[in-house]
């Protein structure tokens, strides 16, 4: 993708592949003034670690919108930590969308690389011509 995000960062995980537990049960936390649950996400198999590239993750979930708004991920190789932080959320057509996300790959306290993902002009439920989805167009682009 040419960024600090990988495929597993932008897709929904198969929840059956992970064990979950609260980071500090009973302790309330906030991200940008909103209540979050802080949850450990531990892969159940080496295959999942290989597929995602992460040994474990600490995710911050807003219960009011059921959305991960921050994550710390332990990268499988190299001793890196990846920090994912949703800086801006918008409700578009009734769907919560992370329109500004910062990703930083760190080794110790040093930032090795960072990516800022910004989404603009997001629209849902648009009518599209089926010809946009031919194999040729999907492979070559418009």
In which residue ranges do the predicted regions lie?
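Short, solvent-exposed mixed-charge patches
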Residues: 141-142
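Gly/Pro-enriched, hydrophobic low-complexity segments
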Residues: 2-13, 32-133
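Short amphipathic beta-strand and strand-loop transition segments with alternating hydrophobic
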Residues: 19-30, 87-89
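Short, well-ordered coil/turn elements that cap or connect secondary structure elements
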Residues: 15-17
